[in-house]
A protein has these predicted regions:
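Short, flexible helix-loop junctions that flank or precede catalytic/ligand sites
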Residues: 1-337
């Protein structure tokens, strides 16, 4: 089992044989006809599985050495609150205000397994407290949301629709206020995402990037070189914020806690994007803290001061270890005075 990012052997459990995993694969996919051929002939596939109404898993089936293996990730039953997610409580009203906007683009980014889906689920859960229609496009559907005071439509690529792009473009006809695109992975989806944000929708999307500057570069570079200048203009006008995140081991060794970099699209940030000066975005984040931006290391310092992570974990995770030390020492001197 992988617990808090590390693999742990399971004691007193029989070793799974290839025949057992193949049998489990057949049982798990018996109602997923669209996936059977892909898994059997293509060597793998991804889907969500609910077990007797008690637990829900994201399942990845893959082939190795001629036999099937599986990775099952437990999807939490409880959607986290903003207070659960963010140690920087003073930023929560700004984040909620962002999610109340009628249109624009919010990107949630980070490596695989770093909590992006959990953050998006919290965002969607908050939005549904108001009378708005939220359309989620996922592959597969992970968190299953209640309507609450709004309306939720959840579409799964490969089951309800053939692609992310098709889901976005056709989804516009279903009159959503908010569209969640669980993965922006290609040119067609990127184009549809920009179009949806420009046409009066709040769009929340995901990229597998580690920080805001890399996110901007990755998104723009998806497009052909001859139209990138125009895309920079459109993207800069639509962007509301980039949330980049990682999960760190909690102090005490049990559980993990999210560490965020938040870049709010201030006029200065929009101008840097248009002018192709992404190398200056890190400085723009530091100088726009009053607007709700926060650097990864500044957030890391907040986690350390709150006792959420140890100093050893913090210094090992810092983007700039030397700068992080100075940040912590400066805060300690201020408290003493």
């Amino acid at each position: 089992l992988r617990i808090d990012g590390y693999l742990h052997p399971v004691e007193q459990c029989p070793v799974l044989t290839p025949e057992m995993t193949d049998s489990f694969k057949n049982i798990a996919t018996k109602d997923l006809r669209h996936l059977r051929a892909q898994i059997d002939n293509g060597g793998g596939g991804d889907f969500a599985l609910t077990f007797r109404g008690m637990a829900r898993f994201r399942v990845a089936v893959y082939k190795q050495k001629g036999w099937f293996g599986m990775a099952l990730r437990l999807i939490p039953r409880r959607i986290l609150s903003f207070e659960d997610l963010f140690v920087t409580s003073h930023l929560i009203p700004r984040i909620k205000n962002m999610l109340d906007r009628p249109h624009g683009l919010i990107l949630v980014t980070g490596p695989t397994g770093m909590g992006k889906t959990t953050t998006q689920a919290t965002f969607v859960d908050y939005i549904l407290e108001s009378p708005r229609h939220v359309l989620t496009i996922e592959d597969p559907i992970e968190f299953v949301h209640d309507h609450k005071n709004g309306l939720i439509t959840q579409r799964e690529v490969g089951v309800d629709v053939s692609s992310f792009r098709e889901a976005v473009m056709k989804g516009l006809r279903s009159n959503p206020n908010v569209i969640l695109v669980a993965e922006i992975r290609d040119l067609a989806t990127s184009e549809a995402t920009i179009w949806a944000a420009e046409s009066g929708h709040l769009v929340i999307g995901t990229l597998h990037t580690t920080n805001a500057p890399e996110t901007i570069t990755r998104f723009i570079d998806i497009f052909p070189p001859e139209i990138r200048d125009q895309i920079r203009i459109q993207f800069s006008m639509s962007l509301l914020a980039v949330f980049s995140q990682r999960l760190l081991l909690r102090a005490g060794g049990k559980g993990r806690v999210g560490c965020y970099e938040i870049m709010v699209a201030t006029p200065a940030v929009r101008n840097l994007i248009r002018e192709r000066k992404t190398e200056h975005l890190a400085s723009a984040i530091q100088t726009s803290s009053s607007e709700g931006s926060i650097s990864f290391d500044a957030y890391l310092a907040e986690l350390f001061r709150a006792g959420k992570v140890t100093y050893e974990t913090a210094i090992a995770s810092a983007a700039d270890p030397k700068g992080f030390r100075e940040l912590v020492e400066f805060a300690q001197r201020n408290r003493q005075h």
